Amino acid sequence: MTVHPPVVGHCDELQVALGAFRASAHVTQRWGDRLAAVLGGGGRLLAAGNGGSAAQAQHLTAELVGRYRDDRPPFSAIALHADTSSTTAIANDYGVDEVFARQVRAHGRKGDVLMLLSTSGASANLLSAADAARAAGVRVWALTGRAPNPLMAGSDESLCVEAPSTATVQEIHLVAVHMICAAFDAALERGEHGARAAGSAASTGRAARRERAASTGRAAGAGRAAQRKRR
């Protein structure tokens, strides 16, 4: 079977881009460590993108609310584009450029992190979100395509992928997402962060056990009282 050049060409393009992106491993490490500190301390990650980048942003939040590899407590992470009712209401009432910015003002708190993904680095709604985040004291990270671009300039930190096609940029963004998650989990495993989250989970578990025990005790007491009454 003949494999057409564009097919293997994409693999070649991806291999080159991935090789170049290895030089950014220290940034994904730093972001993962920082995210562990923020989320482990009760903070939140907000994430947004358009189209394929929205899927990558939601992939990141899913890894944090669920898990990346091993079991661990859930952490607060919201993909802003996933709330279709809010997104469409804001677009209808305030315009598309405000769909993420208004949600950042609603959900973001000082010390939180906003992750924005854009292959062009020029999406107006993401630039507005970055402005809203900085005004709220929320740190802005961006995953973009080639530098320079407006989103890179409007972020606190950015990782720009040097690749000729949108598809390859998005694939490298997914690699970056997994690298960040690996660094995040490693920081938790080292015990540097997440003690509050783990402690909260343990406290919740203890409270639930106490409530179950109290309920059992109340039920047993009611049963004994009923038996005495029947006698």
From Swiss-Prot:
Top-level taxonomic group: Bacteria
All copies of domain SIS, residue ranges: 35-190
Region (Disordered): 197-231
Example of a GO cellular component annotation carried by this entry: DnaA-DiaA complex
E.C. code: 5.3.1.28
Subcellular location: Cytoplasm
Annotated GO MF terms: carbohydrate derivative binding; D-sedoheptulose 7-phosphate isomerase activity; zinc ion binding
Cofactor note: Binds 1 zinc ion per subunit.
Function in brief: Catalyzes the isomerization of sedoheptulose 7-phosphate in D-glycero-D-manno-heptose 7-phosphate.
Family designation: Belongs to the SIS family. GmhA subfamily.
Record's protein name: Phosphoheptose isomerase
Organism: Streptomyces coelicolor (strain ATCC BAA-471 / A3(2) / M145)
Organism phylogeny: Bacteria, Bacillati, Actinomycetota, Actinomycetes, Kitasatosporales
